[in-house]
């Protein structure tokens, strides 16, 4: 998103006020979150932070309902970018082979299966730096057909030009995913082939086209808490902030530069979910990659912290995700309903 798309009005809020009463849950919508303000939320006692996040969550959502989303890799591997976490990068030897774009019928079969299993949102990801115009038409066909099934549609295709965003809007796309990944200061340690401003520009094109924005990041890449606070501040200060905020916990894949990175403390991941909920109270906060390594108690804490969507199914692009039966069993034990699912 360009500077024109970013909130610039700053309301002064003291760190002390952020620590005070749990009644003052979040800043007014016209305020901007300073990194120090977000860091102060991270530093709250764990129980206080979760209590505040749960209060904010209940003001805007049914705390016992989650949305189930399914993510399908429609074009895997061979990406020109050098993202240090990604096994689909052509720069890394992670054993992921480049594949062609999936056929429409295959995608629709996957979408039907996702809907039958309770998903209300179907996301399609392609490992491109940016789509060529000739690639966009088949993707738009996928969007039209999946939307006709009654599913929300989301795609993530890399960087977009303004006219490409407009074409996707005309095809009926509901959401476009383009993550910031981390804070501006830490970004260069993870990616060198695409600038932070490139990402902001694509988000700006998506917003200008009238498509809902899905934008979040990845934690556990060796960053300090300040970088996590910086990421949340960037997201929360978008005008408006994203409708969907996926929070990913790094999945370490052999052959990628980030393999062997010290794992993030699980409670710090929960704190990140809670801070995202407080700073972006009306967003769908999506518990995304990394759930395969989380036990049920940790996932339950994430729901308490304000996560209200999960990616559902056996694969999340090229890494593991808890199987659907396990997900349904966990939600049943927690008395959490899947949005729009009566199965």
Swiss-Prot record:
Source species, domain of life: Bacteria
Lineage: Bacteria, Pseudomonadati, Pseudomonadota, Betaproteobacteria, Burkholderiales
Annotated residues for binding of [2Fe-2S] cluster: 123, 154, 214, 286
Pathway the protein takes part in: Cofactor biosynthesis; biotin biosynthesis; biotin from 7,8-diaminononanoate: step 2/2
Protein name: Biotin synthase
Subunit structure: Homodimer.
Encoding gene (name): bioB
UniProt cofactor note: Binds 1 [4Fe-4S] cluster. The cluster is coordinated with 3 cysteines and an exchangeable S-adenosyl-L-methionine. Binds 1 [2Fe-2S] cluster. The cluster is coordinated with 3 cysteines and 1 arginine.
Binding locations of [4Fe-4S] cluster: 79, 83, 86
Short name of any one Pfam family annotated for the protein: Radical_SAM
Cofactor requirement: [4Fe-4S] cluster; [2Fe-2S] cluster
SMART domains: BATS (SM00876), Elp3 (SM00729)
NCBIfam families: bioB
Function: Catalyzes the conversion of dethiobiotin (DTB) to biotin by the insertion of a sulfur atom into dethiobiotin via a radical-based mechanism.
Family affiliation: Belongs to the radical SAM superfamily. Biotin synthase family.
An example Gene Ontology biological process: biotin biosynthetic process
Alphabetic keyword roster: 2Fe-2S, 4Fe-4S, Biotin biosynthesis, Iron, Iron-sulfur, Metal-binding, S-adenosyl-L-methionine, Transferase
Family matches, as PANTHER family: BIOTIN SYNTHASE, BIOTIN SYNTHASE, MITOCHONDRIAL
EC code(s) of this entry: 2.8.1.6
Catalyses which reaction(s): (4R,5S)-dethiobiotin + (sulfur carrier)-SH + 2 reduced [2Fe-2S]-[ferredoxin] + 2 S-adenosyl-L-methionine = (sulfur carrier)-H + biotin + 2 5'-deoxyadenosine + 2 L-methionine + 2 oxidized [2Fe-2S]-[ferredoxin]
Radical SAM core domain boundaries: 64-291
Single GO MF descriptor: 4 iron, 4 sulfur cluster binding
SUPFAM superfamilies: Radical SAM enzymes (SSF102114)
């Amino acid at each position: 998103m360009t500077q024109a798309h970013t909130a610039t009005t700053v309301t002064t809020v003291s760190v002390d006020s952020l620590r005070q009463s749990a009644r003052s849950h979040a800043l007014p919508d016209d305020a901007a979150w300073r990194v120090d303000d977000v860091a102060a939320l991270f530093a709250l006692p764990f129980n206080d932070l979760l209590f505040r996040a749960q209060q904010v969550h209940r003001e805007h959502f049914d705390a016992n309902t989650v949305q189930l989303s399914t993510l399908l890799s429609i074009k895997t591997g061979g990406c020109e970018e050098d993202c240090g976490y990604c096994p689909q990068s052509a720069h890394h030897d992670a054993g992921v082979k480049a594949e062609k774009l999936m056929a429409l019928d295959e995608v629709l079969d996957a979408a039907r299966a996702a809907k039958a299993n309770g998903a209300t949102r179907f996301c399609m990801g392609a490992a491109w730096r940016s789509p060529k115009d000739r690639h966009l038409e088949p993707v738009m066909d996928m969007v039209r057909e999946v939307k006709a099934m009654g599913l929300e549609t989301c795609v993530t295709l890399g960087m977009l030009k303004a006219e490409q965003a407009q074409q996707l809007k005309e095809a009926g796309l509901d959401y476009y995913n383009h993550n910031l990944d981390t804070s501006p200061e830490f970004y260069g340690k993870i990616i060198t082939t695409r600038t932070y401003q490139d990402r902001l520009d694509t988000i700006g094109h998506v917003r200008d086209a009238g498509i809902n924005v899905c934008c979040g990041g990845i934690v556990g890449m060796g960053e300090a808490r300040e970088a996590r606070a910086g990421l949340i501040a960037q997201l929360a200060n978008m005008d408006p902030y994203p409708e969907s905020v996926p929070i990913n916990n790094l999945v370490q894949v052999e052959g990628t530069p980030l393999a062997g990175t010290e794992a993030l403390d699980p409670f710090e991941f929960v704190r990140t979910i809670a801070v995202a909920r407080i700073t972006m109270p009306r967003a769908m906060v999506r518990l995304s990659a990394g759930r395969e390594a989380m036990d049920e108690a940790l996932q339950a804490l994430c729901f308490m912290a304000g996560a209200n969507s999960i990616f559902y199914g056996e694969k999340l692009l090229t890494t593991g995700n808890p199987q659907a039966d396990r997900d349904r069993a966990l939600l049943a034990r927690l008395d959490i309903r899947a949005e729009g699912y009566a199965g």
